[in-house]
């Protein structure tokens, strides 16, 4: 759950002297250095796939990457690969084994994700793919489907700092290892 919910749970538990541990959210970064392009084979494909795992299970998994930090020297080329790969993601009925991204868990979560996309736009994020609800046909029409979304921006934007818990990823660039580590650790979560 969110940090705010975890805080409330721990307060209630403490008031009743109940020992408790909670597993909360985060803004885990995947960091891509320029040498990933030295291996234009299965390794590079796995790097792109690792980033796209942020979309699977609708992005509603605590271990999903939610920020991508890409070295400046490969930023455009690596993102081109990721964007092309993202076009093959199948959205649909979560009971279909071919589906990679289904509907969000609730209308509340759907609305939260959509509001963060608007916040990202207002703060100047560039939508690279997605950025809207997904309109599926038939029985799935009107469901809480969100397009897998990549938003390019800066680490001080809310889409980089606050947990969205949906199929959205913030991407930014860095110059060197020191800057990558500074960006990676520049959240309240410290992940």
Residue ranges of predicted features:
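ALDH superfamily catalytic-core signature
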Residues: 1-155, 178, 182-183
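Cytochrome P450 core scaffold surrounding the K-helix E-X-X-R motif
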Residues: 157-161
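Glycine-rich nucleotide-phosphate-binding loops and adjacent flexible coil segments
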Residues: 167
């Amino acid at each position: 759950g969110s940090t705010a919910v975890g805080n409330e749970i721990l307060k209630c538990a403490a008031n009743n002297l109940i020992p408790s541990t909670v597993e909360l959210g985060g803004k885990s970064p995947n960091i891509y250095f320029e040498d990933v392009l030295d291996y234009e084979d299965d390794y590079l494909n796995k790097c792109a796939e690792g980033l796209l795992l942020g979309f699977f299970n609708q992005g509603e998994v605590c271990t999903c990457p939610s920020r991508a930090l890409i070295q400046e020297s490969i930023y455009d080329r690596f993102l081109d690969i990721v964007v092309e790969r993202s076009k093959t993601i199948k959205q649909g009925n979560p009971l279909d084994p071919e589906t990679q991204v289904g509907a969000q868990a609730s209308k509340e979560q759907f609305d939260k994700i959509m509001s963060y996309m608007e916040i990202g736009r207002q703060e100047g994020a560039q939508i690279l793919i997605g950025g809207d609800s997904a309109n599926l046909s038939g029985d799935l029409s009107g469901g809480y489907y969100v397009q897998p979304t990549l938003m390019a921006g800066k680490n001080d934007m809310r889409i980089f700092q606050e947990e969205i818990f949906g199929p959205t990823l913030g991407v930014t660039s860095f110059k060197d290892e020191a800057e990558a580590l500074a960006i990676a650790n520049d959240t309240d979560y410290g992940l």
